[in-house]
Design a protein with these regions (language model features):
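Non-heme Fe(II)/2-oxoglutarate
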Residues: 1-81
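Substrate-binding/catalytic groove segments of enzymes
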Residues: 27, 126-130, 152
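Conserved short histidine dyad/triad with adjacent acidic residue
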Residues: 90-110
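Short coil/turn motifs at secondary-structure junctions
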Residues: 95, 125, 171-175
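Short beta-strand His + acidic residue motifs that chelate non-heme Fe in jelly-roll/DSBH
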Residues: 99-104, 151-159
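A short beta-strand-loop-beta hairpin characteristic of the jelly-roll/cupin
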Residues: 113, 121-139
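A short hydrophobic beta-strand segment most commonly corresponding to one strand
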Residues: 116-120, 160-175
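Conserved metal-binding segment of the jelly-roll/cupin
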Residues: 137-152
């Protein structure tokens, strides 16, 4: 199941965050883990629990966005996650690379720890999100909360623009 949190973050904040991540020099091709280089896409780790030199400003921005998403979720009666980042990153995808259908956190999270992913676009790009076989429309300001153990991927992107998405790993509320 995917939970939509609509109009959670104003476009101006997303545009500013997009500019910040575009200017970042720490992008890597580490994901998907274990894939051949041709199948990898640029990913920027914003927060992973460690002290990332030079990432404090982006980390603060990402925390602010997460709190805005959490606040909007509560206003909508959706109390499903804890607003504490376990991980946060940005990814770039475009129409020239088909996304891989994958799962996250099968082996890097303890079995008794329930986590959720939160995904949002920083700009409109003509692509959406596929989760457990169902397509979900993506628009800037709307964030999706989903189970990362279910197969998911970006749908095909139909514009010339590169898509920049922000995604979080957070603890699920269990009661």
């Amino acid at each position: 199941m995917v939970i939509r949190i609509e109009n959670a973050v104003p476009p101006m904040i997303l545009e500013y965050l997009k500019t910040c991540v575009q200017n970042e020099e720490r992008w890597s091709y580490s994901y998907p883990k274990g894939a051949v280089f041709e199948k990898k896409h640029p990913k920027l780790t914003i927060y992973d629990g460690s002290d990332i030199p030079g990432a404090k400003f982006l980390e603060g921005m990402a925390h602010m966005v997460l709190l805005m998403v959490y606040n909007k979720a509560l206003k909508d009666g959706l109390d499903v996650f804890q607003p504490t980042m376990l991980w946060c990153g940005a990814s770039i995808k475009d129409k020239h690379r088909k996304d891989n259908i994958h799962t996250d956190h099968e082996k890097d999270v303890p079995k008794d720890m329930k986590v959720l992913k939160i995904l949002g676009l920083l700009q409109d790009n003509g692509g959406h999100f596929l989760h457990d076989g169902e397509a979900h429309k993506m628009v800037p300001g709307t964030f999706l909360v989903f189970d990362p153990l279910k197969e998911h991927a970006a749908t095909d992107i139909f514009t010339e623009k590169k898509r920049i998405a922000l995604d979080y790993t957070v603890l699920a509320k269990t009661s």
